[in-house]
Amino acid sequence: MEAATMAWTAAGVGMALVYWFVWVMGAAEVKGKRAVDLKMGSITNDKVKDKYTQYWSFFRRPKETATTEASAEKVPAFVDTFYNLVTDIYEWGWGQSFHFSPSLPGRSHREATRVHEERVADLLQAKPGHRLLDVGCGVGGPMRAIAAHSGSNVVGITINEYQVNRARAHNRKAGLDSRCEVVCGNFLSMPFSDASFDGAYSIEATCHAPRLQDVYGEVFRVLKPGGLYVSYEWVTTSLYRADNPEHVEAIHGIERGDALPGLRRQDEIASIAKEVGFEVLKELDLALPPALPWWTRLKMGRIAYWRNSLVVRVLTMLRIAPKGVCEVHEMLYETAQHLTRGGETGIFTPMHMVLLRKPVESK
Ligand SMILES: C=C(CC[C@@H](C)[C@H]1CC[C@H]2C3=CC[C@H]4[C@H](C)[C@@H](O)CC[C@]4(C)[C@H]3CC[C@]12C)C(C)C
Ligand SMILES: C[S@@+](CC[C@H](N)C(=O)[O-])C[C@H]1O[C@@H](n2cnc3c(N)ncnc32)[C@H](O)[C@@H]1O
């Protein structure tokens, strides 16, 4: 073979390899987000590293972030930064629903996710014509599943503008934009009128609130009397021991890597709900047996993580992805280890479910 032909062949093979590596290996968990499209929300490429450093220094000591009023007030802004940094990586590596669900034998992760979301609609007894509120809606995976399953209309609220745009685009694509609406705002002070929703839910979102009373109080205000509210809460369980260094490391790791101003205890949730005026109808940790572990999806993905971190490195080198993505990806990888540890030891659950009702006689 002539040298020129050999060079062209080598170049062709090289190009094919890059194509395979980036477009095929870097394909999305759920089609729609590819590694080559990774952005850092509304942060411009030159600011990603700085924003990540700011985020990290704020949440490095998670418990301290909620202790003074001044730092608690900054939490929503840093949560917004966090979601600018992670939203695309979450969509790429996990899908459009940013939460966990118990594994289901013989069913895919996608199906298990949907079942966990439809359970919310069933608990709320949601019907066509109902107006539901999704508190901390992400890019709207649960909202679309719940609207499709129940026939209800859903309004989602998220602090992160980039997520609002992603969610609206997904709603249009799914043909659900006439029944699913997304608003950018703070769930600690919501831009909705009193008694304007038939039902409300929050899936793994209220853990970002420095004081649960504030978000539950707002949900109480916007619900109609008799309206139901379901929440899946991130909490430490009764197995957590504050004098066990391994427990403390796992919980701090979860808080740091998930923008949490300090996890609450499982036994605090119902009393906070009562404090703001709710009746507690049901309370159950959905992670308890016979439910199968929610963390197996994180564990089974070791090879996928390795592949993803390679993809992210190559894309950063090629300047397709912004500088700082590798650091964010590494942080998420470590967080996954802490979450797995939290699940395996039973000291943490991301699905402590409460079903609450605003009393019929309340204003
Ligand atoms: C409710 C919250 C988010 C829960 C989960 C959706 C996310 C928690 C940790 C995330 C991930 C960890 C490892 C990532 C991996 C290194 C990467 O290659 C692909 C994406 C991950 C799997 C990512 C996906 C989302 C999580 C599982 C919190 C924030 C309250
Ligand atoms: C882990 S995501 C869960 C998203 C969605 N519930 C799901 O399961 O896909 C948490 C969500 O809460 C939102 N959030 C956190 N703090 C908020 C605040 N103060 N106001 C409004 N949204 C907030 C985030 O923007 C994000 O959309």
Curated annotation (Swiss-Prot):
Localization annotation: Membrane
Protein origin, superkingdom: Eukaryota
Cross-referenced SUPFAM superfamilies: S-adenosyl-L-methionine-dependent methyltransferases (SSF53335)
Main localisation: membrane
Signal peptide: none
CDD domains: AdoMet_MTases
Membrane-crossing segments per the record: 6-26
Name under which the protein is recorded: 24-methylenesterol C-methyltransferase 2
